[in-house]
Amino acid sequence: MTLPPVYIVSTARTPIGSFQGSLSSLTYSDLGAHAVKAALAKVPQIKPQDVDEIVFGGVLQANVGQAPARQVALKAGLPDSIIASTINKVCASGMKAVIIGAQNIICGTSDIVVVGGAESMSNTPYYLPSARSGARYGDAVMVDGVQKDGLLDVYEEKLMGVAAEKCAKDHGFSREDQDNFAINSYKKAGKALSEGKFKSEIAPVTIKGFRGKPDTVIENDEEIGKFNEDRLKSARTVFQKENGTVTAPNASKLNDGGAALVLVSEAKLKQLGLKPLAKISGWGEAARTPFDFTIAPALAVPKAVKHAGLTVDRVDFFELNEAFSVVGLANAELVKIPLEKLNVYGGAVAMGHPLGCSGARIIVTLLSVLTQEGGRFGAAGVCNGGGGASAIVIEKIDSDAKL
């Protein structure tokens, strides 16, 4: 069965801020709306009233308010008539939003869909569960919302990093292997930054000054500049004290950010005279034992590649979300991805991992890589807590289209 084509005509993302860092004054909806406005500004042929719906990822929704995707849409200037859906598939939320947007266009229910995701991990609150019924006696415990709803496997009641340690042991990756992967991620990201590779995808954010201080313009991912190779190599393990391999610097960080893409049908592409950046060629999703979520992309990526009518060797570049260095290493080995094709501008270890944003962010960066490094086919995959993963394949089809 031949599916109707779905085109990506614009992308944009915020810089990625560190935890309690440069973007911490911005909410989920601020970050998402900034990315959406920037993406739509690149395609002036599309007016706000032309957009049929928005599908947007977000994981840590406590204290964000009702209907987060709807907030993003209205804050971005989209009309009251906009259909809005918020997606929570943990770290794959942003990618799942893209897949759903594409499916809705294929089904004929929408012609123009804004998709993506955001997260403000800095603004995620602590919870006080006992306050609802009244703490009658003794201490009242606060629960960390970031950890509870973002980083804890509910079945094993263990942190994601413990699963990363299991993955490293199961697949034979040492501390040195993971440190070297992380160092390469930082170096690739630093090189891409210095060469201006991210300029086309990042929409700078202006933070208003207060008490007479000037505004601050944030243009780059905050984590990249924090790289210290000696400190990375000497860092203590976090999740397993004895013979552990996973450290804070060889894993992704807690971050803030947003990313957005504009998808259109072929009919709208022609009607509005839009130049396609890429075509969505296929997607795939998979799941396995919850605590082995780390290697779920090894199932999802081949499914996406097959859905696109390709084989892995025909894909020019890959993006795998680096939740941990071992995630990149293990899935590359299992899928047989040459490391020179993987995350060529660095990954989440160096750039950061705002949970609901990352699945969309890696598609945005993959498109940058295809455009600037001369690739045709690209595949992106992201694991998610609970044992799942999502993957997508895109094809660069118009060399004249500007990011």
From Swiss-Prot:
GO MF, one annotated term: acetyl-CoA C-acetyltransferase activity
Enzyme Commission (EC) number: 2.3.1.9
Gene3D superfamilies in the cross-refs: 3.40.47.10
Top-level taxonomic group: Eukaryota
Biochemical pathway: Metabolic intermediate biosynthesis; (R)-mevalonate biosynthesis; (R)-mevalonate from acetyl-CoA: step 1/3
Compartment(s) of residence: Peroxisome
Positions annotated as active site in the UniProt record: 91, 353, 383
InterPro entries, A to Z: Thiolase (IPR002155), Thiolase-like (IPR016039), Thiolase_acyl_enz_int_AS (IPR020615), Thiolase_AS (IPR020610), Thiolase_C (IPR020617), Thiolase_CS (IPR020613), Thiolase_N (IPR020616)
Subunit details: Multimeric.
Family from the record: Belongs to the thiolase-like superfamily. Thiolase family.
NCBIfam families listed in its UniProt record: AcCoA-C-Actrans (TIGR01930)
Protein name in UniProt: Acetyl-CoA acetyltransferase IB
Originating species: Candida tropicalis
